[in-house]
Structure formats: C-alpha cells, structure tokens
From Swiss-Prot:
<dbReference type="InterPro" id="IPR015965">
    <property type="entry name" value="tRNA_lig_PDEase"/>
</dbReference>
<protein>
    <recommendedName>
        <fullName>tRNA ligase 1</fullName>
        <ecNumber>6.5.1.3</ecNumber>
    </recommendedName>
</protein>
<dbReference type="Pfam" id="PF08302">
    <property type="entry name" value="tRNA_lig_CPD"/>
</dbReference>
<keyword id="KW-0479">Metal-binding</keyword>
<keyword id="KW-0927">Auxin signaling pathway</keyword>
<dbReference type="GO" id="GO:0046872">
    <property type="term" value="F:metal ion binding"/>
</dbReference>
<feature type="active site" description="N6-AMP-lysine intermediate">
    <location>
        <position position="152"/>
    </location>
</feature>
<dbReference type="GO" id="GO:0004519">
    <property type="term" value="F:endonuclease activity"/>
</dbReference>
<dbReference type="InterPro" id="IPR038837">
    <property type="entry name" value="tRNA_ligase_1"/>
</dbReference>
<keyword id="KW-0692">RNA repair</keyword>
<dbReference type="GO" id="GO:0009734">
    <property type="term" value="P:auxin-activated signaling pathway"/>
</dbReference>
<keyword id="KW-0067">ATP-binding</keyword>
<comment type="similarity">
    <text>Belongs to the TRL1 family.</text>
</comment>
<keyword id="KW-0540">Nuclease</keyword>
<keyword id="KW-0963">Cytoplasm</keyword>
<keyword id="KW-0418">Kinase</keyword>
<keyword id="KW-0255">Endonuclease</keyword>
Length: 1104
C-alpha cells in the first residue's frame, strides 16, 4: 500500500512549442548571495566533470571523514540558511507578487534541477517468469552472477533525505504517510541508540544533508490500513541507500546497505545469496513447494537450508509483522556479491540495541488514538513527538495554510524552456520532455519549496517536482525508449526533483558547454558490475497464496461482492486463481472457504460494504475459526488469531488505498467448479453470446446482418437472432439477459460495443445463469503500447463513421462531435496493449475471433492523418482532465473541438483513397468470421495455446519411468514364471493405471522437508538410470525394488529407506503402504521374485 497522490488540479498543461535544447553552464562557486553563479571563461573540463558525484564512505559524521565536496558550495546546492523553525517561518516571499507569472524565459534564464529523493528504477521485464528463471539459473551456473533474494514486507514505500531534504511517500509528500514514516524512523533510532539517540539523530541528518543521500524503506504499520496481516509492531526496513550527488543517482549494493545500516543501527532485511547451480535451482524449487502454503517461519527455514549465504534481518518478521509473508524478491547481482557480503559480515557484526528496555514515550498507535478528530491533528502530534533533529520544522506538512502547497503548472513549461545549468539538469529535462512527447501516463506536479522561502526573489524561484507515473505501461514504454536512446536516465519509482529557476547576466560560456558535453561521456556506465543492462535488471517478485487470499481474493473482491453479488464474486476469484495457476486442490479448498466467507460477510454487513482499510477486523476472526476446523484448513489459511485491533488508532487517510499487485498474467489450470465462466472449449449444446469489444465504425452491425441472413446459420439447428443497441430503449444488457432467459439455447448476436470490464462481467454472469458460452469478436489491429487499437484502425473507424447517413444512433456525418465520440470510445481501452487485451478476453471467455480490418501490405499512415489524430488525442486528454465526461461542445475547449472536428473531416476526405485502399474487403472479412463462428458453434474450438505453469504443485521429487518399458518387463517376468503370470492375471487394468504414473520417489515434502525436495532441482529434467532388481508382492500390493544411478558422476540418492516402483495396490490400500513390503517379506508375509539380470530403465527427474 502506498500513499495516494495528493489531490489538486489535475488539468494538463500545454507545453510550449519551442523548447530550448542547448545547454548552459553552472559551476558551484562560493558566493555571498543566494543566486547561482555562472562559470568563468577559465572553467576547465576537469572541474565540470567533478559535477558527477563520487561514492562516499558511509559512517557517522563524528567517526569518518566528511563528505567529498564538489567544488565549493552555493545557494544552488544548499538548503536556505535562514534556519526553519516550527514557528515564525516567513513564507510571504512565496505567495507575494505572482512571481512565477512574472518570471519570463529569455536568453538569461537558467534552470538547475537535482533529484532529491528516489527509489530504484522500475524495469518491466518483457520475458515471462519462467524465461526469467531460466536466464537467472543460466547466469549463476556459469559464474556470471549471483542470485539475491529478500523478504517482501507488506507496507508503504517511505524515503528520507534528511531533515531539510525531506520525507517522501511513493508519489507524494507532506501528508500522514510521511509523518508516520518520520515518527517510526525516529523511534527506531531511540530504540537502537538509547540515551545517545538525540546526538546520533543529529549526526545522521547532517550526514544525509552533506552527502546528498536518500534512504528508502518499507514502512510497516497498523495505522495506515490493512494488507495481508496487521503487524504486531510498527517498524521500517531499509531497502535502498542512494547517493544523489549532483548527477545520476547511485544505489548501494546490498552488502553496502548492510554496512551502512549497521553503522547507523538501522533495520535491515533478511537476505539470501545463491551462487551455485545447486543452490539457485533449489531456491526456485523451494518456492514452488511453498508458494501455496508458505508462512514466514517455513519459508525462512527452507531458504536458510538451501542458500549459500543467509543474512538474518534486524527484526524477525514473525515477531514484528507476523507469520503471513507477502512474498520474496529475487534479482541478479554481481558475481562478487558473496565475497563482498562475507567481508561486511566479518567487519560489521550486528549492533547492540541500547534502548530496548527504555521508556521511549508514547507509541505511534497511542498518539494516533489520542488524536482521532482529523488528519492534521494526528500529523502535528506525531511531528511534535519526533524532536528537532528529524523535524526542525513542520513547514513541509503545513506550509502557509492560507495558501495551497501546489504551484502553477507553468513551472514545467518554464523548466523545459530554460537553459540547463549543468549536465544533470539537461538529463532531467530530456526525461520530462520525452515523457510528454510520447504522452506517457504520468503527471508532473509542482509544489512550492518552503525550505527555500528566504532565498526567493523575482529572479530566483524554487520548486519541488513530483513525477508520478500512473501505470506500469508508462515504465514499459519508457524502457522501450531507453533501448533506442541508451543515454537516457532511468525512470525511477518515487521520483522527486528540486527545481531552481533563475536569471544570470553572465552570458553563455562556450567552454562550459563543452565541459558539460564531455561530462556526458562519463555518465554512461555501460555494464553494471559486468552485467549487460537486460541481465542487470532481471528481477522477479514471488508472492505467497496465504497473503494473496487475504489481499486479492478477500479485500480486493469486496466491491464486487457487495456491488454485484456472490456470483460475480465467484467469477472474480476463479479468474484470479486461473491467472496465478493455482493448483486444482487449492482451488477447491479456496472455493469452499471463499463461498462461506461471502455468505458470512453479506449476512453480517447487509448492503453496507466492508471497508478495505479495516477488512481484517472481520476477515481475521472468520479465518481463525475456519482454520480451527481441520489441519487442512489451517494450512490453507496459514496463520490466524493474532488480530491487532486498529479501530481506535487507525490514521485518517484521505483517499483509496493502493496496492502494487505486480502479477504476471498466465493461462492457469482448469477451474475448480463445474460451471466456470472460462471454458477450455465452447460446448455445442449450450447457448452462445457473440459480442463486440470494439469501437464505432468497426462494421459490427453490417457483420451481424450478414451473419443473421447467412444460409444454414452456423451449421446446427440453434436459432440465431440479434439485438441492435441503437434501437433498444433503456439499458441494453439487461434486455440481452431477458432474451437469453427466453431462448437459452439460441445464438445471440449482441450488436453493441462492449468496451469495459463492467460489461464483460455482466456477460459472464449471463453465461453462468443461462448455461451459455460467450465469444468476443474484435477488429484485428497491432495496437499501441497502451491501447489494443492502433491509430491506423482508429483512422478507418472515423472514416467509416463520417461516411454514414441516417445512422440509427445518430453517429454519422451529420454528427458535429463524431470525432470526439470515437476518441471517447478509443480511450475506454487505454491502459492495455494488444496482447494484454486479447489475453484477458481469452482468460475470461475461452475464445476470441479476430475480424480482419487492415491489409498487411499497406503503406504507413499519412502524416496529416496521424497528426490530426494525435492532436485530437491531446485535446481529449486536456478536456477529460478538466471536465471529465462533459460533452465536447461544452467547457473550456469547445472552440478548439469545433476547429478540430472540421480539420478531421477535411483531412480524412483528402486521404479517402488511401483509407479505402487499406481495408480488407468486407466479403472476405464476413467469410472468415462466419467460418470461425461455425467452428465454435460445433464445439470444436480450442483457445490459442499459451504457456501454462502450475505453481504450488511440488509435493515430491521422483524419477518418472516410461510405462511401456516397465510393462515390457512385467510381460517378460510373467512369461518366465507361472506364479507371476497367475498373480498378474486379473489385475491388468489396475496395474496399467499404476504404470501410467510409474515413478521412483526420491523425497517427499511432508516426510523429508522442503529443502530436501528442492535439492534435487539441479538435476531437474535430466535422465537418471534406475536398476530394477526384484519384485516383492502379496495379496494387497506389489512393487519393484529400484537402485537409482547417477548424473554426471554424481549419485542421485533417494531419501526413502526402500526406493521402489509401486505396481499395484488392492482397493482401500494406499500407495504409501507399499513401503512396508521388505519388512513383510522378512516376516514371511510377502513373496519375492529376483530379476536376474537386473533391468535398467532411465527416466527424467521431475517434481510432482
């Protein structure tokens, strides 16, 4: 969960057309004024290159050398010297005189920008999870890298850059999240340092300020809303240490983080390193064995056993958070990491905790409980309790309460127009400019920098910029741009920049320009620790089902359960389990539990939806009672019963809670219920709903008419009928549902665009209630990075609509706002690329038909057409941000819309020949769609294949033997031995069933432990020879004695006392009882047939 972005005017700004791309220069000269000073003509290359920050030694200010200075200090790199205090700060300069409005950009205007706080860049891996695993194993096996794994705590991102540098949440600052963060961080110092805490707090803040550093933490607390389990204590865990310097942020390695944290006595995470093929493959196998039932104790124990190095956390997850573990983060790091970690662990032992037994004052929960009236009261109380080192001023939270904290949006325009004062500024301008040009889903929010209030003058302005990326698609698209422009700085998560706009009369300095250009050569790092970029950024997040059932299945399903009912909720959680690839057994268990939960909470709450921020108040007692019923239930739930009551101290949070899911969507296994919404094949004895997730102009009505009149229908006797949306009065989909109930075995052509998930849920509900399948038909298109429909497709749709006459829905050439209407439909699909769009439809409905639209050999879209569409999209974004869904003929941009609608028509008419020529002929399209529908109607359709991986299915490791070879051995034994032939007679069918699953068990999770089963992963899928030497049997069971061979000279050892292949068990006898056959033989209760010579059979080592 992360802080919601602060509210404010979300209107977009029109970036100035002409942006100055040339560089200016700035040296950090000493000055008696607070204005930046431009370099002289004698500035050397060496001096400007020193603007690139160099790593510092970590440690306390009193115990280590001071920070390396970059040149001399100036107002550009200093916090204002006025000494902010909790009262009396003069903010009149900020709000007096409309300084920004009067600040004009000319040749003497410069900008200095520095990153003030940031977290790691977010790289969206384009590979599947399985491909990432394979690459990780390959790199570790070759000695090119080490795999690092850490615990994923359930909390909020919190960043701290010193008492003047500021405190930040993921996309905001100056709110309850950061107030709680500062309080908890200060309390960690008091707990660690005891009576020395005030002195160490001051030193720590001074150290961060002088070295321009930022530490990032996971803030885990019970006062900011529920995750998977309410933590037993409030704490932080340091996850990143960043040197911001005067250039590109430099992140510490994990060993450096641990060294830094142990010197300052800050909490560190539990970390494991895997540097061999055996250990890294064992890790992935251990996770697969635990992912459906793992809790903190079992996971940490298993990883401790298989890892090469284990570094325990400063705070035990079980003691401060609880047993419910969100997940693990695995990433590739340098092959030297193990050696570096060993050195750090040797030189920096865990520090003492001097304040453990001291009275630290009121706790976070006590303070929040005492100030429940409003959020500002809670923040003030928390900040007063922090002390002067961490909070010398509360200006960041309250500023001047008679004025807004946000600044005018023109800050960004002037930032981009100004000459960059140094190389770092030029790179930040490059980032923002590209994100705007590519229209990435991001907001650039500017705020007054209250810490610099005393330094402000008409020619010297200071602001804070928050770069808020709205969706993961923004990171994906930016990463794609980095492939074409390797010199781009990464797009960071938690991205805050200090901006200084100022005037200088020194003129331009050509030597400084050259110096800055040369500095850029030193910025490209090439490979990180010898790793190529793609490999250096390999990371995978792995979450546990015990956490997901609480957050994703219970909490995130509340709105569906209360709004749409139990049936829709069931569809939701089945789809989630399918996406995750949950094993069949767990699906059945979860269905039973979640159905019971849905009935329980609806009965208790009625129509009053349970709050997602306090859902555990109801869910935890329910889960506790459910777990007590059986051991199986207890394993499913993981842990329950230690509920922390939050109702009296929950912080007042303005806005919805946010959760980073980071789930990779895959086709899952067969759902656990007999009537799933998603079907592996469409059944021909059911009804059929054909619907269109499309845009006006896709020819769906014309297609429906042709399909309705097609001779012979769809090859069977089911009636076909259609319902045209433009002719239906009232709500359309309830009418379709009525028709389905009247004619449950009919084929319904739903002639209406179905553009969003709410409609898809209604269709799923119809399918479930009326025993029908649904088939989506979509116009084929390459799409864009964030939309399943390309601009080419959009152009054709608009062209078709503007050729219509007398359209029933009044959307034709006479419609004055037709272009706006199509843009509105187009944006309903925003946020999904083509692959994501199609995958979700297939996951929901089990089928998909692509309606041919554009010829593959067409020439590119003409520039005038592309340009007018892009202008329309920009205008739509401006309009929707300011006015929401208000008609285009109303509002601020009405005149611009009128002008654009005319320009659109003129442009499309001028390019009508091109737009007509690129379309697939209508008759060809109809024929292809009809044939695919016939296949579906017959029940012969199978959905497109996709990678399927069953997680959580590892229970034991075994060698899988070919059934034909074992069967051949039995035939030979029967032919040579009448007694054996007599024994086998009458058991052929049951033996054949066993032979289909014949295997030699090596280790079982319940009997031998997760780590033991996982240890076989280094030989996964390798052929292992097995020598069969004898057959032992009686009237209840029979099995072959097996001697397991070796792989690459290493003997594969079975942990079973008697390795064997079970051939047969009588009814009521479990396979496990076959383990007793050797003892029964010694007791004279079983017979033995020696196989001479022994028979050798090979099979792959697999997990089951």
């Amino acid at each position: 969960m992360d802080a919601p972005f602060e509210s404010g005017d979300s209107s977009a700004t029109v970036v100035a057309e002409a942006v100055n791309n040339q560089f200016g220069g700035l040296s950090l000269k000493e000055s008696n004024t607070n204005a930046p000073v431009l370099p002289s003509q004698t500035t050397s290359n060496h001096r400007v290159q020193n603007l690139v920050w160099k790593p510092k030694s970590y440690g306390t200010v009193s115990g280590s050398s001071s920070a390396t200075e970059v040149g001399k200090t100036s107002a550009v790199s200093q916090i204002g010297s006025s000494g902010d205090t909790k009262v009396g700060l003069n903010l009149s300069k900020i709000f007096g005189g409309n300084l920004l409005e009067k600040f004009s950009v000319d040749k003497s205007t410069y900008c200095h920008a520095q990153i003030r706080a940031t977290f790691y860049p977010k790289f969206e891996n384009e590979k599947t999870d399985q491909e990432i695993r394979t690459r990780m194993i390959e790199m570790v096996s070759k000695g090119l890298a080490t795999l690092e794994v850490s615990l994923k705590h359930s909390g909020s991102l919190f960043m701290y850059a010193g008492h003047k540098g500021g405190a930040y949440a993921k996309n905001s600052f100056g709110n309850i999240y950061t107030a709680v963060g500062v309080f908890v961080l200060s309390r960690m110092f008091r707990e660690a340092w005891g009576t020395k805490a005030p002195k160490k707090e001051a030193e720590f803040n001074d150290f961060l300020e002088k070295n321009r550093m930022c530490i990032s933490m996971e803030l885990v607390t019970a006062v900011l809303g529920d995750h998977g389990q309410r933590p037993l204590d409030d704490y932080v865990v340091v996850t990143a240490v960043t040197e911001l310097g005067n250039g590109k942020p430099q992140f510490y390695s994990t060993s450096e983080i641990i060294s830094f944290c142990r010197k300052w006595r800050l909490p560190t995470n539990h970390v494991w390193l895997f540097s061999t093929r055996k250990s890294v493959t064992s890790f992935f196998a251990a996770f697969d064995a635990l992912c459906e039932e793992g809790i903190a104790t079992s996971v940490c124990r298993a990883l401790d056993e298989v890892a090469d190095i284990s570094v325990p956390a400063s705070k035990d997850h079980v003691k401060v958070q609880g047993e419910i573990l969100e997940g693990l983060v695995a990433r590739i790091v340098s092959s030297q990491s193990s050696r570096d970690m060993e050195n750090v662990l040797r030189d920096h032992p865990p520090p003492p905790c001097d304040g453990a037994n001291l009275d630290l004052g009121l706790s976070l929960r006590e303070i929040c409980a005492a100030h429940r009236s409003n959020e500002k009261q809670q923040m003030r109380a928390l900040l007063r309790s922090v002390g002067p080192s961490f909070c010398p001023s509360d200006v960041e939270w309250f500023g001047d309460e008679s004025h807004p904290k946000s600044a005018d949006k023109s800050v960004i325009t002037k930032f981009l127009q100004s000459q960059p004062a140094d190389y770092s500024t030029s790179k930040l301008q490059e980032m923002v400019r590209l994100m705007k040009e590519k229209r990435l889903p991001a907001a650039f929010k500017c705020y007054h920098n209250f810490h610099r209030a005393e330094d402000i003058s008409p020619d010297n302005l200071f602001y804070k910029l928050v770069v808020h990326v709205h969706s993961d698609s923004g990171f994906r698209r930016y990463h794609k741009e980095m492939r074409h422009m390797p010199s781009l700085w990464p797009l960071y998560r938690g991205f805050f920049v200090d901006i200084n706009l100022f005037k200088s009369n020194k003129g331009r300095d050509l030597m400084a320009l050259k110096s800055i250009d040369n500095a850029s050569e030193n910025d490209g790092r090439g490979e990180k620790d010898g790793l190529a970029d793609d490999d250096a950024n390999l990371m995978i997040k792995m979450k546990f089902l015990t956490y997901k059932l609480r957050t994703f299945l219970i909490r995130n399903g509340l709105s569906i359960l209360f709004k749409d009912g139990a049936a829709a909720y069931k569809t939701y959680y089945l789809r989630q389990m399918k996406i995750w690839g949950t094993s069949d057994g767990k699906q059945k268990e979860l269905c039973k539990m979640l159905d019971e939960w849905a009935a329980y909470i609806r009965r208790k709450c009625g129509n009053d939806q349970l709050s997602s921020s306090t859902y555990l108040s109801e869910a935890e007692p329910f889960l506790e009672q459910y777990a007590k019923r059986s051991p199986k239930n207890h394993i499913l739930i993981g842990s329950a019963g230690n509920l922390v009551r939050t109702e009296d101290f929950l912080a007042i949070v303005d806005g919805d809670l946010d959760e980073e899911g980071d789930l990779v969507k895959k086709q899952g296994v067969t759902p656990a219920t007999p009537e799933p919404a998603v079907k592996e094949a469409v059944q021909k004895d059911e009804g059929l709903i054909v619907f269109f997730p499309g845009i006006p102009g896709s020819a769906k009505s014309a297609l429906c008419k042709e399909l309705l009149n097609a001779p012979g229908g769809f090859g069977d006797d089911r009636p076909v009928h259609t319902l045209m949306g433009d002719l239906v009065k009232g709500k359309y989909w309830p009418k379709v549902a009525d028709e389905r109930r009247k004619k449950p075995q009919s084929i319904m052509l739903a002639d209406k665009n179905a553009p969003n998930e709410d409609v898809w849920r209604q269709i799923e509900d119809m399918c479930r209630r009326t025993r029908a399948s649904a088939v989506p038909i979509v116009a084929d298109s390459e799409g864009t990075d964030t939309n399943p429909y390309s601009l080419d497709a959009l152009a054709v749709f608009m062209f078709r609509v503007l050729q219509r006459v007398n359209h029933p829905g009044k959307l034709d050439k006479e419609s004055s706002n037709a272009g706006y209407v199509l843009l509105m439909f187009y944006h309903l699909y925003e946020g999904k690329n083509r692959n994501e769009f199609e995958s979700e439809l297939i996951e929901r409905f089990g089928s998909l038909i692509k309606m041919p639209l554009l010829k593959s050999d067409r020439t590119p879209l003409p520039d005038p057409v592309k340009s007018v569409l892009e202008e329309g999209i920009d205008l739509f974004n401006l309009h929707s941000r300011r006015h929401g869904r208000l008609e285009s003929t109303k509002g601020t941009y009405a005149a611009e819309w009128t002008k654009w609608e005319k320009q659109l028509r003129d442009t499309l008419v001028a390019n009508s020949e091109y737009l007509s020529s690129i379309q697939v002929p209508f008759e060809s399209m109809v024929h292809q769609v009809r044939e695919e529908l016939k296949t579906i109607a017959k029940g012969d359709y199978k959905p497109p294949s996709s990678e399927k991986r069953k997680h959580g299915s590892i229970v034991f490791a075994a060698i899988n033997l070919p059934a034909t070879q074992v069967h051949s051995l039995l035939e030979k034994l029967a032919a040579a031995n009448p007694t054996m032939r007599s024994f086998l007679e009458g058991k052929k069918k049951s033996i054949q069933e066993k032979l289909e699953r014949s295997h030699v068990t090596l280790a079982h999770k319940r009997s031998h432990g997760v780590a033991t089963v996982a240890s076989y992963s280094q030989h996964l899928n390798r052929e292992v020879p097995v020598e069969l030497t004898e057959l032992i049997y009686n009237d209840k069971m029979a099995a072959l004695t097996a001697h397991v061979g070796s792989v690459d000279g290493e003997t594969v050892v079975s942990k079973n006392e008697w390795p064997h292949v079970t051939l047969w068990t009588a009814e009521g006898v479990t396979a496990k009882e076959a383990n007793t056959l050797p003892q029964l033989y010694l007791e004279g209760k079983a017979s033995r047939l020696v196989i001479d010579p022994p028979v050798s059979i090979s099979g792959p080592l697999e997990f089951f």
